[in-house]
Structures are given as structure tokens and as C-alpha cells.
Amino acid sequence: MANYTAADVKRLRELTGAGMLDSKNALVEADGDFDKAVELLRIKGAKDVGKRAERATAEGLVAAKDGALIELNSETDFVAKNAEFQALADQIVAAAVAAKANDIETLKAAKTGDTTVEQAIADLSAKIGEKLELRRAAYFDGTVEAYLHKRAADLPPAVGVLVEYQAGDADKGKEAAHAVALQIAALKAKYLTREDVPEDIVANERRIAEETARNEGKPEQALPKIVEGRVTGFYKDVVLLDQPSVSDNKKTVKALLDEAGVTVTRFVRFEVGQA
């Protein structure tokens, strides 16, 4: 008897772009373990698996103010465009600043007007008849550049970035930090440096690269060099300082920051509908 359902196959196809038969076979080989099935499809060459697997289903918006960034979810984009929903997000991000809230539990308990953030969300949810959720929050207390991006002109911002930085020259610092925020919004860096990437994630990427190269029939003696090349490519995808700059792809983000005398100390990126 199969240890997976038709819904599992459908979800795996949506996340990975793989065909029905490949998805079924991956679930069989993984003994019903969904995450393992995704990994097997990566090894076998399904396109964009890693990027698609990050997706979630949600609508809503991101809002930023004075070092704070929040994501507030709704069930539909109709509500995301609602003026009261957007006003609530503004109230919540202001509360995040006042409370210096770096997590949703702290922020839910924070005051907004004569109530709490949690109650304000519940009140609007009851009024409009749709589930609303405060999904995540971040707060940086240093010098911060924020950037918000809209997916469509008639929708509120769906991508938000905070970049905390240090700079000797305020104007150069702000200019460089803004460029970095745009970079993060577009290329979705997850880590600041290579050292920030967890060892188990690097080891897993190395293993997948080796298995993929073997499946492609690469000669055994060439595997170490191929694997290192693919791991380097992985770093360029996920590590901010290793990425080619969108403003000058002949230079890395690190090189451009060094030229400007700017140090990025941390960053965060929220995107509605993604993990």
C-alpha cells in the first residue's frame, strides 16, 4: 500500500516542477518522506526545485519603519488591498519600533492604542471575516536602510529588506546600503558570509553535488573539482558578500562595499508567501 496520497503528489509537483511519474517515484523511493522526495528530485535534476520548495501560500504585506520590519498575512489579495488592513500593518510596525520587538510573541503583546497588537488583529479579523496572521517581525537598533518592493502597482509591498550597516561617511553609507537592500530583494541572499551558512547545509549541498555529478556520468577523478565548483556556485546564490553585484556584475558585493568603506553587520528579508 502506498505511504503517500494524491495530495502529496500534487504538492510535490507544484513545489518542484517535476512530472507526475517522477514525483510518484520520488515519494516511493523516499518511503513517503516529503522532504527526502524533494531532495531526490534535486539530485535527479528537477529544475528550480530549491527555489520552488521555499514557496508558501499566503497573501498580505510587509511594512517597515525605523529599523522594524513585519509581515502581516491575509487569506486573499482583496483583503491585502483593504485600507483598514494596511492601516493595521502601519500600527503594528509602529508598535514594533516602540517595543523593539524582534519576534512575533513580543510584538503580539505590545500595545497599540488602547489594546494589544494581538487583539487588534483579532478585532479586524472578526470585522472583515477573514483569518489574519502576524507571521514574523524583526528589529535592528543600529543604522538601518529599509527597502520595500511591490509585485504589482495595485498591491501593497510584498518584499521587505532591512540592512544594518556601519560607515565612515553617512551619505556613502546610505547609498551603498540602499544598493545592497535592492540586491537582497532581487537575489534573495540568505546569509551574510560563508561562515554564517550552517555546516550541515553545506555538507548536504556537497553531497547532492557529488551524487548529481555521478548521475551525470562525470569521471571519478574529476568529481572533487566539480563538487567544489558547484558548492562555490551555491555560495554565490545564498551568501550576500559572495554574490556578483547587480550594479556591476564584474565585482562582488563585498568588493563594492569595501570600496565604499561600508560594513554590513546583518540583514533580513521577508517575502509574503515564502518561507
Swiss-Prot record:
Name recorded for this polypeptide: Elongation factor Ts
Similarity comment: Belongs to the EF-Ts family.
Crosslink (Isoglutamyl lysine isopeptide (Lys-Gln) (interchain with Q-Cter in protein Pup)) position: 36
Pfam families tied to this protein: EF_TS
Record region (Involved in Mg(2+) ion dislocation from EF-Tu): 76-79
GO terms assigned for molecular function: translation elongation factor activity
Species this protein is from: Mycolicibacterium smegmatis (strain ATCC 700084 / mc(2)155) (Mycobacterium smegmatis)
Protein's cellular compartments: Cytoplasm
UniProt function note: Associates with the EF-Tu.GDP complex and induces the exchange of GDP to GTP. It remains bound to the aminoacyl-tRNA.EF-Tu.GTP complex up to the GTP hydrolysis stage on the ribosome.
Higher taxonomy: Bacteria, Bacillati, Actinomycetota, Actinomycetes, Mycobacteriales
Record GO cellular component, one term: cytoplasm
Cystine pairs: none
Keywords: Cytoplasm, Elongation factor, Isopeptide bond, Protein biosynthesis, Ubl conjugation
Broad class of the protein's primary localization: cytoplasm
Xref: Gene3D superfamilies: 1.10.286.20, DNA helicase RuvA subunit, C-terminal domain, Elongation factor Ts, dimerisation domain
Record bears the keyword Membrane: no
Coiled coil: none
